[in-house]
């Protein structure tokens, strides 16, 4: 229809050609056209108009045509739509239309209209709609019942018509049989033979399925037989026999249970003929009575049947000859046949509800097989028996209540203690699945219920009325002496204070400054064969003072030295008596609080005292001899052998590697070692990636068992290609990428190593390494740093770009770009760009930034005191542009070093790429 509003009058005018004055559809053709218009209807007005037209139509042909064309399906669609939109008026109109249509069961099965209407009758909110839907449901139920009952009746009629001939012959047969007493017809004989043969099989099913077929005729025959048996045994009050008869009748009933209504005329017509022809009467009433008796006795099939068999077996033998004689006698009893008619009718009323037991049929067959000849006599007393049977059956059906004393029954169960059962235990998978489904449903319901719950109180708070209680009659504890005892006790003890905060927030954080633990060195003489106890340090600064009483801190250099000496074995000095390191430290430190740690490095005999501490521990090897080479023996750390070379041979490395040749100054001289860089300050295990080996450019394991990354190659070996960015000078933690120098450096004691971005540097012992980007510089034994100028190492050397400067042990090196500076041991060097510096350990660099020398990432040996760097102290000044931190001295933006925070020190110390609070950046807040 159009999109605008619809006028129903205009719509009716358009449909005027199909409708008469009352709005009823005129013809079958008109309803099909109206249906096509209904399919296009979208507005509620037009739909209601069409529904009213259908309501006005009275012709069943037109309505049936509407249903056949598809109107019922269309109404189903409209019903579904209006139900989803909850359109009550349209729903009522559709229900009225459905009630008006002549629907059948087949129509109701086509779609879910019936289901929707039933839902509306139960769950609709509108009461009128509910009533209307319930009325429609009841009407449809009546249609279903009537059609379901008429359909089998129609089928039976068809069958009966087909079998009418066979059915009509059986009543005629008894007439001919009784009169002529000759059973010449083949059909009856066959029927008798069949029960005999079928007795062994299960004929009950056959009879139950084929109602009114050939097996019916034997059912008539057994009826007679049962009747004859009753004649003989009725006086003896043989109750099971009537039951048997019922079973036989059940077979008859099985034959024709569906056509119950049709049986009544069959029963009545024979009754009318009974008066005229007496012999016809018995078989017909027996059919009806037998069927009713079977129905009455249906609920008690099993036990009674057995009893019947017991009683029947002796009596059945007698009647068989008796019946053979009295085949003509049924006429005597037939006058009573009119009597059974009324009971049969009464029973017919009971018939519809009672089911026919198929179980009894086989026994029927047994009785029939036992006495086929006795059938004629049985019908005689059948009329009387059925009444008794029905009475007995009714007695059995009566409801009896127990006596008062038996109304209650008590059952006692003794619980065995050992038979406790876990009720909550899941027995099988199905039960577990049920429990899970229930739990899921419960969770879903609670979630749905609480989804919009804001946990706000809906009920306003009402202050309760104050309770006015009378004063207590007894004061609790008035006569107690315990309160005085408690009061006396509290006078002499501290008061217990429980400070409850006003809010439940976390307490204010207490200020906590981690204090580094004091380092108490072990007695050197006693630690000969003992592995020292290594204490894990708490987070904090570097090590504390060596003496337990002193509060002053050792400089990091000395603290690391002490740790390294404690880690290794301490053999006695060459004189046989161990040197007391504690005394040397106290002599260096002086009074505990007199000097800061920087000033300690400026003492004139500082280097000598350091040598005294290091020599007995083998950290510098044995003392010098005539030709400047140490003797063999366990001089190196960890007991490594030094093989004495010839006068012109190279100095062997500490692990058996070949040492480099002597530096420019000459033979290896003693001097303090470079600072240790970690928990194991001197030696790395094999393959330590951070100290030697491939990660830092070390040349890999060498001839010795534990090749150390710092002494990777001998002084004479060519350096490997420089790895990018970082390396280690002598295996220490080298600078980061901005420094641009690194690579495997010279060993501290062994052969001169190299730094690919700096050139191989000289080792501490000997070997002339060089740093190609710095110029040749002497290690402790000699070396050079090409880009810095020839500078003296600890044993001598030079750094070309920095000017010649003296090493610790001797040799006058200089650093041309920095100015002359004095080495520690001798030889006043100069640094041209920095100004004159004085020789000895107190050379200074006027233009350098003040600070501790140990912070230099390139890390020249910290004991190679360079004197004053500006206002700084000797050996401790920052080299402003020559070294210092990679990041301008402040590493606070880097992650905090966890080793430093956990242990108090870090193996990489100043060369560590992470943030050490208070060392390479501001302390933590």
Curated annotation (Swiss-Prot):
<feature type="modified residue" description="Omega-N-methylarginine">
    <location>
        <position position="668"/>
    </location>
</feature>
<feature type="cross-link" description="Glycyl lysine isopeptide (Lys-Gly) (interchain with G-Cter in SUMO2)">
    <location>
        <position position="179"/>
    </location>
</feature>
<feature type="modified residue" description="Omega-N-methylarginine">
    <location>
        <position position="696"/>
    </location>
</feature>
<dbReference type="GO" id="GO:0008157">
    <property type="term" value="F:protein phosphatase 1 binding"/>
</dbReference>
<feature type="compositionally biased region" description="Gly residues">
    <location>
        <begin position="775"/>
        <end position="829"/>
    </location>
</feature>
<feature type="compositionally biased region" description="Low complexity">
    <location>
        <begin position="325"/>
        <end position="336"/>
    </location>
</feature>
<feature type="zinc finger region" description="C3H1-type">
    <location>
        <begin position="891"/>
        <end position="919"/>
    </location>
</feature>
<dbReference type="GO" id="GO:0019888">
    <property type="term" value="F:protein phosphatase regulator activity"/>
</dbReference>
<feature type="modified residue" description="Phosphoserine">
    <location>
        <position position="382"/>
    </location>
</feature>
<feature type="compositionally biased region" description="Gly residues">
    <location>
        <begin position="540"/>
        <end position="551"/>
    </location>
</feature>
<feature type="region of interest" description="Disordered">
    <location>
        <begin position="587"/>
        <end position="890"/>
    </location>
</feature>
<feature type="cross-link" description="Glycyl lysine isopeptide (Lys-Gly) (interchain with G-Cter in SUMO2)">
    <location>
        <position position="262"/>
    </location>
</feature>
<feature type="modified residue" description="Phosphoserine">
    <location>
        <position position="591"/>
    </location>
</feature>
<feature type="domain" description="TFIIS N-terminal">
    <location>
        <begin position="73"/>
        <end position="147"/>
    </location>
</feature>
<feature type="region of interest" description="Necessary for interaction with PPP1CC">
    <location>
        <begin position="393"/>
        <end position="408"/>
    </location>
</feature>
<dbReference type="Pfam" id="PF08711">
    <property type="entry name" value="Med26"/>
</dbReference>
<feature type="compositionally biased region" description="Gly residues">
    <location>
        <begin position="656"/>
        <end position="665"/>
    </location>
</feature>
<keyword id="KW-0597">Phosphoprotein</keyword>
<keyword id="KW-0238">DNA-binding</keyword>
<dbReference type="Pfam" id="PF00642">
    <property type="entry name" value="zf-CCCH"/>
</dbReference>
<feature type="region of interest" description="Disordered">
    <location>
        <begin position="536"/>
        <end position="555"/>
    </location>
</feature>
<dbReference type="InterPro" id="IPR036855">
    <property type="entry name" value="Znf_CCCH_sf"/>
</dbReference>
<keyword id="KW-0479">Metal-binding</keyword>
<dbReference type="GO" id="GO:0001111">
    <property type="term" value="P:RNA polymerase II promoter clearance"/>
</dbReference>
<keyword id="KW-0832">Ubl conjugation</keyword>
<feature type="compositionally biased region" description="Basic and acidic residues">
    <location>
        <begin position="596"/>
        <end position="611"/>
    </location>
</feature>
<feature type="region of interest" description="Interaction with WDR82">
    <location>
        <begin position="418"/>
        <end position="619"/>
    </location>
</feature>
<comment type="function">
    <text>Substrate-recognition component of the PNUTS-PP1 protein phosphatase complex, a protein phosphatase 1 (PP1) complex that promotes RNA polymerase II transcription pause-release, allowing transcription elongation. Promoter-proximal pausing by RNA polymerase II is a transcription halt following transcription initiation but prior to elongation, which acts as a checkpoint to control that transcripts are favorably configured for transcriptional elongation.</text>
</comment>
<dbReference type="GO" id="GO:0005634">
    <property type="term" value="C:nucleus"/>
</dbReference>
<protein>
    <recommendedName>
        <fullName>Serine/threonine-protein phosphatase 1 regulatory subunit 10</fullName>
    </recommendedName>
</protein>
<feature type="modified residue" description="Phosphothreonine; by PKA">
    <location>
        <position position="398"/>
    </location>
</feature>
<feature type="compositionally biased region" description="Basic and acidic residues">
    <location>
        <begin position="846"/>
        <end position="871"/>
    </location>
</feature>
<dbReference type="InterPro" id="IPR035441">
    <property type="entry name" value="TFIIS/LEDGF_dom_sf"/>
</dbReference>
<feature type="compositionally biased region" description="Gly residues">
    <location>
        <begin position="728"/>
        <end position="766"/>
    </location>
</feature>
<feature type="modified residue" description="Phosphoserine">
    <location>
        <position position="545"/>
    </location>
</feature>
<dbReference type="GO" id="GO:0140767">
    <property type="term" value="F:enzyme-substrate adaptor activity"/>
</dbReference>
<dbReference type="InterPro" id="IPR003617">
    <property type="entry name" value="TFIIS/CRSP70_N_sub"/>
</dbReference>
<dbReference type="InterPro" id="IPR017923">
    <property type="entry name" value="TFIIS_N"/>
</dbReference>
<feature type="compositionally biased region" description="Low complexity">
    <location>
        <begin position="679"/>
        <end position="693"/>
    </location>
</feature>
<dbReference type="GO" id="GO:0003677">
    <property type="term" value="F:DNA binding"/>
</dbReference>
<keyword id="KW-0539">Nucleus</keyword>
<feature type="compositionally biased region" description="Basic and acidic residues">
    <location>
        <begin position="879"/>
        <end position="890"/>
    </location>
</feature>
